[in-house]
């Protein structure tokens, strides 16, 4: 006799899991010794009606949230409070398989001209997000570093320490020129905490350089809390092939 119980046929639960995992490919003192990950899990319970009872089937889906670029060794030596965004240390670094980690094992020089050197962890034609570091020499003994992540024709940059200094502005200009001329990137994003002590000055400085504030619900933004994103759109000819 068929079961007549009245029950919902679908239950769903979502949660986010963050953590830190040891990367054994690097010594413990390396800035790459650990990577931080963030997974979004969705557990769904479906119930099907059978002649005598309900049958439950559980599905568990895992969604990798957006990566965050690593800091290089000089930047990792800065005090925690001096990092461009404290959430960088809580960054959403997705766990990878051993084979993938070997492919991303070291940054290699991709381009060097004038004061700008560009380092990459992977070929730019790779389908996965790629780490891009931009090192701009200010003096013989100092340089400005912009750490970025290239993903789906979009470049996300973490602002360096003391981003408002003139040297850092020059380094960003050189970075934007390289991105426009040498890559197929359509948009460059910078980000900083919404409660940053220099929030107003940062908004004015980046606006002056052509950046625009991005609304929080923009579909291209990663799910980072308390962060302001600004975007620099690159004008591309419709017939221009990706480089």
Curated annotation (Swiss-Prot):
Q: Which residues form a coiled coil?
A: none
Q: Which Gene3D superfamilies match?
A: 3.40.630.60
Q: Name one GO biological process term.
A: negative regulation of stress fiber assembly
Which of UniProt's keywords are assigned here? Cell projection, Cilium, Cytoplasm, Flagellum, Nucleus, Phosphoprotein
Q: Which residues carry this modification: Phosphoserine?
A: 6, 9, 12
Q: Which family does it belong to?
A: Belongs to the ODC antizyme family.
| Further comment | PubMed:17040916 reports an event of trans-splicing that creates a hybrid 14-kDa protein whose N-terminal 105 amino acids are encoded by the rat Oaz3 gene, located on chromosome 2 and its C-terminal 33 amino acids by a novel gene located on chromosome 4. The nuclear pre-mRNA of Oaz3 gene has 5 adenosine residues whereas the nuclear trans-spliced RNA has 6 adenosine residues suggesting that an unknown nuclear process adds 1 adenosine affecting the reading frame. Moreover the hybrid 14-kDa protein is the result of ribosomal frameshift.
Sum up the protein's function in the record's words: Ornithine decarboxylase (ODC) antizyme protein that negatively regulates ODC activity and intracellular polyamine biosynthesis and uptake in response to increased intracellular polyamine levels. Binds to ODC monomers, inhibiting the assembly of the functional ODC homodimers. Does not target the ODC monomers for degradation, which allows a protein synthesis-independent restoration of ODC activity. Stabilizes AZIN2 by interfering with its ubiquitination. Involved in the translocation of AZNI2 from ER-Golgi intermediate compartment (ERGIC) to the cytosol.
Q: Tell me how this protein assembles.
A: Interacts with ODC1 and thereby sterically blocks ODC homodimerization. Interacts with AZIN2; this interaction disrupts the interaction between the antizyme and ODC1. Interacts with GGN. Isoform 2 interacts with PPP1R16A; Modulates PPP1CB activity.
Q: What is this protein called?
A: Ornithine decarboxylase antizyme 3
What gene codes for this chain?
A: Oaz3
């Amino acid at each position: 006799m068929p079961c007549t119980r009245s029950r919902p046929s679908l239950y769903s639960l979502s949660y986010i899991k963050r953590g830190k995992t040891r990367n054994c490919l690097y010594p413990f003192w390396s800035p790459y010794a650990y990577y931080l990950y963030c997974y979004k899990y969705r557990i769904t319970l479906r119930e099907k009606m059978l002649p005598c009872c309900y049958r439950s089937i559980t599905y568990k889906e895992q969604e990798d949230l957006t990566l965050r670029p690593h800091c290089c060794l000089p930047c990792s030596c800065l005090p925690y409070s001096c990092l461009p965004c404290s959430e960088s240390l809580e960054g959403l670094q997705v766990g990878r398989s051993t084979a993938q980690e070997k492919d991303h094992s070291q940054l290699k020089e991709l381009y060097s001209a004038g004061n700008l050197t560009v380092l990459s962890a992977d070929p730019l034609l790779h389908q996965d997000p790629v780490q891009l570091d931009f090192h701009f020499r200010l003096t013989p003994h100092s340089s400005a570093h912009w750490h970025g992540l290239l993903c789906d024709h979009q470049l996300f940059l973490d602002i360096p320490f003391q981003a408002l200094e003139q040297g850092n502005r020059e380094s960003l200009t050189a970075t934007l020129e390289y991105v426009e001329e040498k890559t197929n990137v359509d948009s460059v994003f910078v980000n900083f905490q919404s409660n940053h002590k220099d929030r107003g000055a940062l908004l004015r400085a980046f606006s002056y350089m052509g950046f625009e504030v991005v609304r929080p619900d923009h579909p291209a933004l990663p799910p980072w809390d308390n962060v302001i994103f600004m975007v620099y759109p690159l004008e591309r000819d419709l017939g221009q092939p990706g480089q």
